[in-house]
Amino acid sequence: MKHIVKQIHFVGIGGAGMSGIAEVLVNLGYEVSGSDLSRNAVTDRLEALGARIAIGHDAANIAGANAVVVSTAVRSDNPEVLAARHQGVPIVQRAVMLAELMRLKQGIAIAGTHGKTTTTSLVASVLAAGGLDPTFVIGGRLISAGANARLGTGDFIVAEADESDASFLNLYPVIEVITNIDADHMDTYGHDFARLKQAFIEFTQRLPFYGSAVVCVDDPNVRQIIPFISKPVVRYGLSPDAQVRAEDIDARDGRMHFTVIREGRAPLAVVLNLPGLHNVQNALAAIAIATDLGVSDDAIQQALAEFNGVGRRFQRYGEVPSADGGQYTLIDDYGHHPVEMAATVAAARGAFPGRRLVLAFQPHRYTRTRDCFDDFVNVLSTVDALVLTEVYAAGEAAITTANGDALSRALRAVGRVDPVFVASVDDVPDALAGVARNGDVVITMGAGSIGGVPAKIVQHIQQKA
């Protein structure tokens, strides 16, 4: 007998990965409930759409649920998980629920260590401009849509594929993107980089024979796995052997201008409303998919020129008064791995040439700080001024040799930047007020609670006005 599902409960519904799936299910007509430790804009939006939201985790919250959705971040002793197990309610992993949504449509899954959210957003935006009206589930808020998910009427669903817990192996899309492969979340793979690369190969094996793997050939680790991909491959990037390639790249006024070369097609002049070479690569993935699906060149050009970005991905907050009577440019970014951070710093240098770059950085996870310690020191040493916070633990036990103080000491030993260390992220606005000067570019960066700092700075200014 088929198990009838009417109500679906999400444990940790306010998270980026969970909320998007929940929103799509609400729009499909399911009764959706969920719990989280605190309210945020995402839970408020879901509640307005009709979801039932509880603050705090309690067994009573799953009342009436026919399925309970969890992510790998949810502990097995969570009271709602225990209640579901006791009551015989199916417990479904987030990626499995995403896979079920993909079964309803043709899936386009975006994978890679870095750039998933921006690339997913670019693909969704270009397909929408081409009239394909895709469903999308994104790990950040697509600013033009005001949400991180949307139920479209078209045949495609565009979603991020998460390698951090190997859950992307639950997905069976028809098109896959691999942006890059880097050493992150290595606990999942037993600290064996070969196992991580093998997981990406296995990911491509989920494609049907008529599917395609769209891969960034600029990344050496992606290039290494191409011979082991048994499905059709489309190579994109800046490399000469890329089938979808960018040439004549020019950074101007915070935008990237370039020409796209595609096999059998006329060159396409593109203006991308994002800075940085890494975003040129991300846009090429979207162009490759859009071209394959028959989106017109005019629609591709329009979507990229008008792209408004994603929340916390080089998100601009405008000009902010500085303590010396001038003003500085405030930007917020989700970067938390040295490779991502280096790309964002390079993008900022290209978008704002000659201006002093101030970074406020909150490291994310002690294990990542430990594993990438020297790389963090190197990238943080490339900015002109630095405010550094204690590590955002994300549930991990503290590691004294990889905390904020240890990172500060290592940076001072190198001697290229003298960090201002603050123990709490709440102290970042005051620290920035003492560092930022007229004409500076200030970036708040990290995957933890520092994401709330720019809004606090802007709110403080509005209250003083």
Swiss-Prot record:
One of its GO terms (cellular component) is cytoplasm. Keywords: ATP-binding, Cell cycle, Cell division, Cell shape, Cell wall biogenesis/degradation, Cytoplasm, Ligase, Nucleotide-binding, Peptidoglycan synthesis. GO terms for molecular function: ATP binding; UDP-N-acetylmuramate-L-alanine ligase activity. It is found in: Cytoplasm. Pfam families: Mur_ligase, Mur_ligase_C, Mur_ligase_M. It catalyses: UDP-N-acetyl-alpha-D-muramate + L-alanine + ATP = UDP-N-acetyl-alpha-D-muramoyl-L-alanine + ADP + phosphate + H(+). Disulfide bonds: none annotated. The keyword ATP-binding applies. Its EC number is 6.3.2.8. The keyword Acetylation does not apply. GO terms for biological process: cell division; cell wall organization; peptidoglycan biosynthetic process; regulation of cell shape. Pathway: Cell wall biogenesis; peptidoglycan biosynthesis. ATP binds at residues 112-118. It is an enzyme of class 6 (ligase). Cell wall formation. Belongs to the MurCDEF family. This is UDP-N-acetylmuramate--L-alanine ligase. It comes from Burkholderia ambifaria (strain ATCC BAA-244 / DSM 16087 / CCUG 44356 / LMG 19182 / AMMD) (Burkholderia cepacia (strain AMMD)). The gene is murC.
